[in-house]
Amino acid sequence: MLVLFETSVGYAIFKVLNEKKLQEVDSLWKEFETPEKANKIVKLKHFEKFQDTAEALAAFTALMEGKINKQLKKVLKKIVKEAHEPLAVADAKLGGVIKEKLNLSCIHSPVVNELMRGIRSQMDGLIPGVEPREMAAMCLGLAHSLSRYRLKFSADKVDTMIVQAISLLDDLDKELNNYIMRCREWYGWHFPELGKIISDNLTYCKCLQKVGDRKNYASAKLSELLPEEVEAEVKAAAEISMGTEVSEEDICNILHLCTQVIEISEYRTQLYEYLQNRMMAIAPNVTVMVGELVGARLIAHAGSLLNLAKHAASTVQILGAEKALFRALKSRRDTPKYGLIYHASLVGQTSPKHKGKISRMLAAKTVLAIRYDAFGEDSSSAMGVENRAKLEARLRTLEDRGIRKISGTGKALAKTEKYEHKSEVKTYDPSGDSTLPTCSKKRKIEQVDKEDEITEKKAKKAKIKVKVEEEEEEEKVAEEEETSVKKKKKKGKKKHIKEEPLSEEEPCTSTAIASPEKKKKKKKKRDNED
């Protein structure tokens, strides 16, 4: 049986001399305690040495992926096929590939693993012609090269640095806000007017660090930090400040907090520049499309640039809005149109009605840029610049769609109404004051004429009745002299007679005119009786 043993120096093929001892797996390690004992079990048949580390790296990457290298294929065809013996391999996947392509019987078992372990322990004595120093140097170089290959390592392409940098940048922003708020509240007890005069946080902390107590503002020179007008205003406010007095220990603690704020803000600017440079080195096209901050947040959200490249455009569009997405799906409402990509400059400068369209188009182009940066060999940002120019042109067409110029026959079709200045004097309509519902019905001309005739007839009848009533009243007045009881009854009848024509007929003007005449006649009769 032959044994294929891979080393960092080259391929070694051993011949098993005593196969009976392989049956005792538990005691096989005793046979490899010394080089002499090991030479009695296995013997080197062929050794194929690598020329350099690059060749060794290519061979081992092929073995890791379960593939056969060209160099290994030549060795197996030359040595193993001629021997017509089974081949022991350390990897079952590699054995399957060898059997498929070269038609060689391969063995992989716990016995083979124990045999490989014994050969590895006595490798210096079993492989002559290779110095231990050379073996150690090749092992170290191959280990570094293999690690770089497996981790996709590159000095310029480390997306882990971007993930950590953007996370630290967000943490620094939160800490700075907390520290600045605490500093303003703390020093506000001593000099509250300063917070209203100086709005910039960093300038505020620098002024505190330079002056300290409120009494020192009169003699302090703040021309390096503030304009002349603001400096004069600060000094004037310090003289008439309504703040309380504080001790020197309080001022020392406030100043120490100010130094912390200044140092953190300076480190934040340095970290932001580092992030910009790292993004331009790793993902230049993504940086051009969405900016360094949004691009870094997308990479951090996905975990790495390779993971982000595996996402679809629709996923990248709503990346960062997972809570809103699942909430919308649960409540069966409209899903969100954008996530982290909303903070890109192209989406921000768009009108609200076009934000959804632009975010969808930007996500599609950003995915192309991500995949180009992740898998492309070229590190230029030409593709990103070209796609951004297309998106900006598309954005201009969307914004100017309603303001297009009319040319040709369109001018004749587009009729514009003439402008007329209406300066008519309007009167107040009191009919709108009533809250009662009014329903105005139009009447026909014939009906109006008939109604006029009826009213005229009623008026004539009313005049005749008034004359009759006057005559009857005269007779009744004469009868009133006999008895007072009869007079009262007659008076009741008079009232009854007066009310009947009013209830039956329409209101007329003649009755209203006749009533004062009746009263005069009654008075005359009463005077005559007396």
Swiss-Prot record:
Q: Give positions of region: Disordered.
A: 409-530
Query: Could you list the residue ranges that cross the membrane?
Result: none
Residues where Phosphoserine occurs?
109, 304, 351, 484, 503, 515
Primary location recorded for the protein, binned into one broad class: nucleus
**Gene3D superfamilies linked:** 1.10.287.4070, Nop domain
Quaternary structure, per UniProt, is: Core component of box C/D small nucleolar ribonucleoprotein (snoRNP) particles; the core proteins SNU13, NOP56, NOP58 and FBL or FBLL1 assemble stepwise onto the snoRNA. Interacts with NOLC1/Nopp140. Interacts with NOPCHAP1, NUFIP1, RUVBL1 and RUVBL2; NOPCHAP1 bridges the association of NOP58 with RUVBL1:RUVBL2 and NUFIP1. Interacts with PIH1D1. Part of the small subunit (SSU) processome, composed of more than 70 proteins and the RNA chaperone small nucleolar RNA (snoRNA) U3.
- The name this protein carries in UniProt is Nucleolar protein 58
- The gene it comes from is NOP58
